[in-house]
Design a protein with these regions (language model features):
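N-terminal mitochondrial targeting presequence
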Residues: 1-2
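Conserved alpha/beta-domain cores
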Residues: 8-162
Length: 162
């Protein structure tokens, strides 16, 4: 029998989760004062196409102005799917401007390990260029049959996975 060893991932308190649309800044303070341990600021499903860019700007502003960690919150940003033209700017703008204030990037519609690899490479390049001390984790949403059929490879694709 063969065994494969994995580096342990970061463990974060996640008893309750709250999704907050990036297009609704008034909801940021409510999320901050909620009992949720884990908050994901959403750039994907909860945001209409016309609001994608302003939602990204709202999230960057909120991460700069609000001390989420002081309230014990784990902060994730759900980026747009890799097959959209928003995804690249989501990762680059968030990481370059507030990468030190983000715990994880939530990647939707992951279908293969190469999807994770792409995000991992972007994060690594930005973290190195910006000299960020903490590595941002990656969380994957498996939402398709393709993702389910590749689940083992996806689960082994990065030591950033949480």
């Amino acid at each position: 029998m063969s065994h494969q060893y994995y580096n342990p991932t970061t463990t974060r308190l996640q008893r309750s989760e709250l999704a907050v649309p990036g297009s609704s800044p008034k909801m940021f303070e409510k999320a901050l004062n909620s009992n949720a341990d884990y908050i994901f600021l959403d750039l994907e499903d909860a945001v209409s196409p016309n609001d994608k860019i302003s939602a990204r700007e709202n999230i960057i502003k909120a991460l700069n102005e609000i001390n989420w960690r002081e309230k014990g919150k784990t902060i994730s940003v759900r980026i747009n799917s890799l097959d959209t033209h928003y995804m690249y700017r989501d990762v680059v703008d968030i990481m370059e401007q507030v990468g030190n204030k983000v715990d994880t990037i939530l990647v939707p519609k992951v279908g293969t390990s190469s999807d994770v690899y792409m995000v991992d490479c972007l994060l690594t390049q930005i973290e190195n260029q910006k000299k960020l001390k903490n590595k941002v984790g990656i969380e994957c949403l498996i939402e398709t049959a393709l993702g389910m059929s590749n689940i083992k490879e996806i689960a082994q694709s990065s030591n950033r996975l949480e």
